[in-house]
Curated annotation (Swiss-Prot):
Protein's gene: etfB
Pfam families listed in its UniProt record: ETF
The protein's required cofactors: FAD; AMP
Record organism: Mycobacterium tuberculosis (strain ATCC 25618 / H37Rv)
SMART domains, A to Z: ETF
Presence of keyword Transmembrane helix: no
The protein's name in its UniProt record: Electron transfer flavoprotein subunit beta
Source organism phylogeny: Bacteria, Bacillati, Actinomycetota, Actinomycetes, Mycobacteriales
Length: 266
């Protein structure tokens, strides 16, 4: 039996305009459309494929999704449940606002401790809002579990998990004994679309809501005021302007060189 927990995150849609709040420079999550991060959809898909493969062999398992976020994150949870996840855990506490990656990893590790029988934790390699790529490794460190990160292929057999990681140097095969933490990249699979039946079923699936107190995390261990880093200032990205057009009437090459020199590119 493989009981899998998938870490998911609701993020601003990459097609929406993303803004920082004026006061503390944290991401203004209400200013943009919110979606389940695409890499998390792939993580959920991988968990479902593992569960389905084992079910075909007569092995029972479950898939639980875990997220930390405000009330709005329920939308991401329902998307994962409609894909086929069995249940969800939602860490919802205002004290998490502004937490850095270390604090977030700590809180998620504590929340994982409330889910019994977890043998595998699957995460995306990095979120599209923070792009830190550190949370899976941080959680593995806190839990004292082996970690296999940035995987493009995964298989489980005999209480061991094997994965492939592709780098500029080549493709490496990694192996660990369960329980373990893994992260997957965009090459791992193509996520399924929720069916109408799945969408309706998701409304009835169990969602456990937890607070920081319920997972044994003190208020001074998380949050903006206790973060290990502070953003002191933020400057909006300049609006795009039309580029300089060069009409080649025999001097095009010289004009391009002059432009590059003026821009201190060459």
């Amino acid at each position: 039996m493989t009981n899998i927990v998938v870490l998911i995150k609701q993020v601003p849609d990459t097609w929406s305009e993303r803004k920082l709040t004026d006061g503390d420079f944290t991401l203004d999550r209400e200013a943009a459309d919110a979606v389940l991060d695409e890499i998390n959809e792939r993580a959920v898909e991988e968990a479902l494929q593992i569960r389905e493969k084992e079910a075909a062999d007569g092995i029972e398992g479950s898939v639980t999704v875990l997220t930390a976020g405000p009330e709005r994150a329920t939308e991401a949870i329902r998307k994962a449940l409609s894909m086929g996840a069995d249940k969800a855990v939602h860490l919802k506490d205002d004290g998490m606002h502004g937490s850095d990656v270390i604090q977030t990893g700590w809180a998620l590790a504590r929340a994982l401790g409330t889910i019994e029988g977890t043998e595998l934790v699957i995460a995306g390699n990095e979120s599209t809002d923070g792009v830190g790529g550190a949370v899976p490794a941080i959680i593995a460190e806190y839990l004292g579990l082996p970690q296999l990160t940035h995987l493009r292929k995964v298989s489980i057999e005999g209480g061991k998990i094997t994965g492939e990681r592709e780098t500029d140097e080549g493709v490496f095969t990694l192996e660990a004994t369960l329980p373990a933490v893994i992260s997957v990249n965009e090459k791992i699979n193509e996520p399924r679309f929720p069916s109408f039946k799945g969408i309706m079923a998701a409304k009835k699936k169990e969602v456990t809501v937890l607070t920081l107190a319920e997972i044994g995390v003190e208020s001074d261990e998380v949050g903006l005021a206790n973060a290990g880093s502070t953003v002191l200032a933020s400057t909006p990205k300049p609006a795009k302007t039309a580029g300089e057009k060069v009409t080649d009437e025999g001097e095009g090459g010289n004009q391009i060189v002059q432009y590059l020199v003026a821009q201190k590119i060459i």
